[in-house]
């Protein structure tokens, strides 16, 4: 097995300083999860044939399998199969796998003493689960390992653990040690891959967190890579393999339907914007029918805050589907398309978009935008992000003189 220099420092820390809590945070693809998987394996091996219990915590059972168990299998050279209560045996001990994203997940960790835990993607776990798992690790010699990507610097994982790096117990034992990883620490990544990731990661918060591993608060304009000289076009004489729509219902603020096309080279086009105030659902049904008449029976990905409106669209023969509204992931998706010039806007067919793109800003101290100047941009996000996540309507390839 090979480790880069920072991974070696983590292993050395585990061997010689042996902190009660060891945290690796930082950039994606930097090697922090892999080294902690190895370290956790070393820790369990110290208790061979003791019949003790250990914990692996992750967002879901699927993420635990993907992020940890697959690597464990590769290291051990054997398959890991979970029992009905989601444990497997290792070195004569039991390792329990708990998903910990929900408020009541802490209940899964109750009822036994653990001799160690590995919390994967710790910022995605509920704080009560993290604290319950740590409290369970009361066996003599128990150790806790966490890995995570950076989020807002006020997150409990940073405040309660990372910011206490170097904390000592009264007996001289190191309690908490934290390591920070950047993408550049992983020297096993080839130069071409690193350059590609740099080029495709949106500027600002996303670059600081995903590449530099910095716990930074969001601030300023959300879509920093939008460039009117690049992203506005007059026409898109291209073949489109798919067309779909995003819908954000409104009244005092703008209601919006956007028409989005996906080209043959996987470039998205904002073809047209419909944005109006004080329009009832009957008006939007009419707009949707106009769109269907022009482009075919396309999908409409809708804000599900108004299920009654979605129902009315559906009974009028419109393929209205609940949008996926994950704010940060959706924004990251659209921001990446702007960064890579994979999202272009037909300038003459939009109006409200032109002001929103410059006034859509992050809420101070929060990983979410201010709820203002977001109507067309929300519908655009719903359209693109949902279509990427779902299997959208198939659209016969044809040439549009757009």
List where the protein language model places each region.
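Walker A/P-loop
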Residues: 18-38
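ATPase catalytic-site recognition across NTP-hydrolyzing enzymes
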Residues: 186-247
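ASCE P-loop NTPase helicase motor core
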Residues: 124-200
């Amino acid at each position: 097995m090979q480790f880069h220099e920072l991974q070696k420092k983590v292993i050395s820390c585990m061997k010689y300083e042996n902190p009660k809590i060891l945290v690796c945070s930082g950039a994606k693809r930097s090697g922090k999860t892999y080294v902690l998987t190895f370290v956790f394996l070393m820790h369990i091996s110290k208790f061979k044939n003791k019949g003790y219990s250990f914990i692996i915590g992750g967002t879901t059972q699927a993420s635990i399998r993907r992020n940890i168990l697959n690597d464990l299998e590769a290291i051990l050279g054997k398959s890991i199969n979970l029992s009905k209560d989601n444990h497997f045996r290792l070195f004569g001990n039991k390792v329990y796998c708990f998903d910990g994203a929900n408020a009541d997940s802490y209940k899964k960790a109750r009822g036994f003493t653990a001799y160690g835990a590995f919390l994967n993607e710790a910022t995605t776990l509920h704080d009560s689960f993290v604290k319950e798992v740590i409290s369970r690790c009361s066996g003599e010699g128990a150790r806790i390992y966490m890995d995570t990507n950076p989020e807002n610097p006020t997150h409990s994982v940073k405040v309660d653990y990372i910011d206490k790096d170097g904390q000592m117990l009264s007996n001289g034992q190191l309690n908490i040690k934290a390591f920070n990883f950047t993408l550049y620490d992983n020297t096993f990544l080839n130069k071409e891959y690193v350059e590609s990731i740099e080029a495709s990661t949106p500027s600002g918060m996303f670059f600081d967190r995903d590449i530099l591993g910095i716990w930074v608060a969001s601030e300023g304009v959300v879509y920093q890579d939008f460039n009117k000289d690049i992203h506005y076009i007059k026409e898109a004489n291209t073949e489109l393999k798919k067309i779909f729509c995003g819908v954000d219902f409104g009244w005092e603020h703008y209601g919006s339907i956007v028409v989005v096309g996906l080209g043959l080279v996987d470039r998205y086009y904002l073809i047209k914007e419909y944005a109006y105030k004080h329009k009832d659902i009957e008006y939007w049904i009419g707009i949707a029918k106009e769109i269907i008449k022009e482009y075919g029976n396309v999908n409409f990905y809708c804000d599900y805050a108004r299920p009654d409106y979605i129902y009315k669209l559906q009974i009028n023969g419109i393929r209205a589907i609940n949008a996926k509204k994950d704010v940060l992931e959706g924004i990251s998706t659209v921001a990446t398309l702007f960064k890579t010039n994979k999202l272009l806007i037909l300038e003459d067919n939009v109006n409200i978009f032109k002001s929103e793109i410059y006034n859509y800003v992050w809420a101070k101290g929060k990983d979410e935008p201010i709820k203002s100047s977001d109507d067309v941009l929300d519908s655009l996000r719903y359209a693109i992000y949902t279509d990427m996540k779902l299997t959208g309507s198939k659209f016969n390839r044809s040439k549009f003189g757009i």
